[in-house]
Amino acid sequence: MKFVFEQIRTGGDRNFAYVLGDREAGVAALIDPSYDPEAVVERAKAQGLETAYIVNTHGHEDHTNGNAQAKKLTDAPIVAFRGSVAKPDFPVDDGHVLQLGSLHLELIHVPGHIDDHIVVYLEEQRVALTGDHLFVGKIGGTQTEDAARTQYVSLQKILDRLPDDITVWPGHDYGCRPSSTMALEKATNPFLLAMGSVDEFLALKRDWATFKAEKGLK
């Protein structure tokens, strides 16, 4: 098996899509092929891969607006968390493992930013596609304190589940680099540094604009 991995800038709000594939099996999964689904499909084809799945990390429009066109071009099913607003053809539950040739894509439910969010984790390849759950140096926004509390629990779940050497590939290019590692995020991401208690985490969420200004962050 030869692992195929591509990060693709698709436009929108600095969105990333991804192509994951097994070259020997000739199959690929497209992750969040929004804004420019044609380009994402073509990248899979250029690698000699047939698209078997279209996976949404979550149901926000900026991650799903390419679904219809990607499905039209590939006839692949939409995969998302059960009950997702993305209305998946193939709904999954927490911990479902999607088989893609010899690749195993573990889908980890991480509600908070939105209830249907999942992280796509490939343990053998040391890769996690974190969508809007975890960015480089930041995390996804929340609309309510209840959602922020849920997000805190989900972040702890990821901290417990993903080892330090896992590469983090986010859904947007919001950080100082397009990818990171769990070790680097634990050491530098302000929100992960505030995971000592939920109160500390919530305080940073509330004061994030001030914190950014004081630290000169964008």
Regions found by a protein language model. Name each.
Residues 47, 71-73, 146-147, 185-188, ...:
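Glycine-rich, phosphate-binding/catalytic loops in enzymes
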